[in-house]
Amino acid sequence: MHIAFAASECVPFSKTGGLADVVGAVPRALAALGHKVSVYTPLYRNTKLENPKTAVRSITVPFDDQYRFCSIVDGGMIDGVQFYFVDYPAYFDRDALYGTPIGDYHDNAERFALFSRAVIEGSKILGVPDIFHCHDWQSALIPVLLRTLYAEDPAFDHAKIVFTIHNMGYQGLFPGEILPLLMLPWDLFTLTKMEFYGKVNFLKGALVYADFVTTVSRRYALEIQTAEYGFGLEGVLRGRSGTVAGILNGVDYSEWSPETDRFIAAKFSADSLAAKAQDKADLLREFGLPETKLPVVGIVSRFAAQKGFDLIQQVGDRLAREEAIFVVLGSGDKTYEDLMRRLSKQYPNRFAVRVAYDNALAHKIEAGSDMFLMPSRYEPCGLNQIYSLRYGTVPIVRATGGLDDTIENWDPITNRGTGFKFVEYSGEDMLDTVRKALELFKDKTAWQKLMRNGMARDFSWNTAAKEYVRVYEKAKQVRAPMPV
């Protein structure tokens, strides 16, 4: 099967979030299963290519009664995956991928409409796939275009479209007047197609026109069909619930494993847990703290309400009075950056905070912490809780999205489970759950059993790739009904 991925970012070439990790990993896992895989992504200013070659010299894209000419660069084959880069410097030769600290780029609709057109036109020359696998709003026009403007093009008669939602909170909303600028017909601006409260919604268009929709955990696939998590599109998703599936993200264990991690002070495994104490001591030194027998609770996160920082705001001073040390790495909303700085200043022996992102330090926190706190309001999949399992760092999570799918609550009677979960989104419920974990930590036999349970779990990309293949096979048997 030939699968073509289309996404706005992809490791190792560009990254702002988890989308890039998925688009960097799933194609490789599919190629390892014997499939032909290509990836289309923009050529940004900071994209580094070793031996770039022009694959398609000139693609014509109509815009506002004019034509834009872009090219596609051949990025070569990596681990069995062919990489192509859409090159249009006026749109992609910029300091950042989507915007400045002040806000999004004003022409993001045009930028990613051009990208979507270029992928379709480029595939006519480079090879139309059996499956177009598109990701998030930046490539959401591909399903729309293929089922409208390209519906009569025989080149795409047999191509199917799978669309993956990584986060419903980002939908690609633009003024209705953008449609003629993008040379898209006004009849798309209806309630059953792309209109959304007076705006054009790119994500909605993909949900309407794709043959199959996936998201990044089973629980999140159900949650987004409810008003609480659907961000206004729950009705669209419920209307096609038979072609919506959740597939858990995997983890690259060559990068995230305590047995091989190049960033940590001491390597360890489930059979040699004693060495983890050296990583704990190294982590405390990194933050200028003395060695201690108290449990260390790690947090690596964007500082935002979605990530549960409003709960930490509610009970932060009470957390600081617990017999634990909280080690925090991240950045984000100024309100929560200020909160973290205050807690670290007021309770220097209980809260250690680094307002930044540092990949090496993130590894040290995973390896050196005893627990890892992720109290998210919603979490499509989440990766840090999966990393934590492999490092024997016990997750404390809210039971939502991928956090609920990946963490099994500890049962002291059966000694089963991999972490601690709370259901109610409240500071009190979170605090109670942290206290349960701190209490169990005193029982070293039970705690080591809990650690080893988590370390035995396998969330490799190979498992996810096989599930995607099953979705592709289903997509080949269906076709999204045309909206009226």
Curated annotation (Swiss-Prot):
Coiled-coil residues: none
- The enzyme's first-digit EC class, named in words, is transferase
PANTHER family found in the cross-reference section: ALPHA AMYLASE DOMAIN-CONTAINING PROTEIN, GRANULE-BOUND STARCH SYNTHASE 1, CHLOROPLASTIC/AMYLOPLASTIC
GO terms (BP aspect): glycogen biosynthetic process
Binding-site positions, ADP-alpha-D-glucose:
K15
Residues spanning the membrane: none
What catalytic activity does the UniProt entry give for this protein? Answer: [(1->4)-alpha-D-glucosyl](n) + ADP-alpha-D-glucose = [(1->4)-alpha-D-glucosyl](n+1) + ADP + H(+)
Cysteine disulfide links: none
Q: Which domain of life is it from?
A: Bacteria
Q: What's the short name of a Pfam family annotated to this entry?
A: Glyco_transf_5
Hey, which pathway is this one from?
Glycan biosynthesis; glycogen biosynthesis
Could you tell me what this protein is called?
A: Glycogen synthase
Query: Which UniProt keywords are listed?
Result: Glycogen biosynthesis, Glycosyltransferase, Transferase
Q: What's one GO MF term for it?
A: alpha-1,4-glucan glucosyltransferase (ADP-glucose donor) activity
Q: What is its EC number?
A: 2.4.1.21
The text of the family note is:
Belongs to the glycosyltransferase 1 family. Bacterial/plant glycogen synthase subfamily.
The entry's function note states:
Synthesizes alpha-1,4-glucan chains using ADP-glucose.
Q: Which InterPro entries does UniProt cross-reference here? A: Glyco_trans_1, GS/SS, Starch_synth_cat_dom
